């Protein structure tokens, strides 16, 4: 599973980078990828809002709330 780590990025830059990453990954019809957002509820909310806007399915694992698993 491919992953993107957003640590150290400003929120707006991180969302742009996550959007580009997920859109590229989604060209594969059966994709799943991981976005590492860290321990920031603001970052998580911004990234999940972007994912919702594109209609992607995702979940945040209970064992690691610092990541988002995305699929189509």
What do the PLM-derived regions correspond to, one by one?
Residues 1-72:
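N-terminal targeting/trafficking signals and adjacent low-complexity tails
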């Amino acid at each position: 599973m491919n992953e993107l780590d957003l640590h150290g990025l400003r929120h707006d830059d991180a969302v742009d980078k996550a959007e580009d990453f997920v859109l590229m990954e989604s060209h594969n019809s059966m994709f799943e990828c991981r976005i590492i957002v860290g321990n920031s509820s603001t970052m998580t909310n911004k990234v999940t809002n972007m994912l919702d806007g594109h209609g992607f399915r995702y979940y945040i694992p209970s064992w690691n709330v610092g990541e988002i698993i995305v699929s189509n």
